[in-house]
Amino acid sequence: MRLLSFIALCGIVMMFTACSNEDVAQGSVETNTANNDNLTTFVTGNPATRTSLNYDDGAFFWESGDYIYVQDDNGTWHKSSNAPTEKTASFKFKVPGKYTDHTSYKVYYPGKQGINNNVTISASQLQKTPNSTAHIGEVGDCGTADATGGNGVFNFRLDHQAAILVFQPFTENDAVKNCYLTKIEVTSDNDITGTYTLDTTTGELTGSGSGKTITMTTKGDGSYAQGFPLKTSSANVATNGTYVVIRPGTHALTVRYWIKDYVTQVEGAVTKTYPAFDYEKNDYYDMTANLNVTDYDGTKYYMWDAENNYWNGHEWNSAAPWQPVLKDKDNSNYPKSGSDSCYYRSTEGIGRDDAKYSCKKLPNANELAWYAEKGDARWDGERIWTTMGHLYKGGMWFKNKAFIKLTESFSESYGPGFYGDMRDNWGMISKSVAQGAPVGFFAERYFFLPALGSYSVGYLYKIGEEGCYWSSSAGNNNSNCGYMLEFNKNTVSVNTTGSDVGYYVMEFE
């Protein structure tokens, strides 16, 4: 994690043309604009001054709508009567009040949503273009300075009181590179957002904020209307650098990176955790993350025990693709006869018949029954995954074989309960499922099966809605069928189906 200081040096020239004779109760804000003779000029002349920053060198600039606040000799708060109208390296602020009694005055920048020394770090933040910091003054960046000097000339070095996280997600998954970053949710173990006060003595943020979560939306106009791109295989601040303002301090963070595939219309989050770390004021921190979404091989759809996959030679990523990659799309060039090596292996449906080719290493019918009956099947509609160049979500969690064996007689030779050996005698199971991913100490003893759908007569059916997985056991209740495990958000079942459908081939844990 790189951190860079962004202390900015500012100069103030205070030109006392007249003293204000207006008495205003302490705590109110005076913004006299009627007569410039009653104003003091605060000049910021350093080219690296304030409220937006350059990532590479830490240079700051004033942005449109930036105001400063100063307490005068009477203790009255005064807001500058003017502000920049565009990004600028220097600006002459006009500030009402009397400033002749002291050689030091504290200057406050409470952000664009603040007043006097009151600061709001927003729970909802918005950045419209990558690697832009024009918004940080809007969402809680703030600062103070002790202006010292005399004879009408005062200088100060602005001390920023917030911390900034610079998120730079990347991915090695080509399907994720086709997606966009739509928002980032940052959740802390303590407060990072809310209303705070800039202490009049130390200048630091004080008080307890009201929120532990900040949501940064990463959408703008034009080419960024859908979000920020995710096209790089390593961190690149120019591509999608996102700046989130937080309260400084020691925080353990959980970050959810929300991404969306606008072809499938699937949106979901990749979660990363960052251990407790002291995010100091006046600094910004690189928060890089590899969005390593699991990708499932689109060439693993087979008819039961076929020698080659359903679209062999014309897979989705081949030179001459026939394979549909989106739900309800089809291609008529699917396998149609036994002479095709992509066609299923013919079976008689009498007694046991074990797979010889593509399904040979898969769980058999008995094992599928154990997973369905005793595997605590849990539907997870939020887990995202990719296949064939696109983002999808949804699937089922099951206890792994070793975990089931701790309490059950998991066996390859017979099914649970009264089923006996389902390879010899037909049986079927259908059960309701629980909802949500497993949590707690034993969560790591589960494995996930994505809802990869299936192919039938060339159509891709219910991807993201159903999971359909072959076993190594042919059906014994009819010819040319095979045992399979099938699930959706409500049920999980083990049964036989026609061998001519393209189900997924995967070894289970």
Language-model regions, residue ranges each:
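Sec-type signal peptide cleavage vicinity
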Residues: 2-373, 379-381, 387
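C-terminal, surface-exposed recognition/capping segments
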Residues: 385-388, 392-509
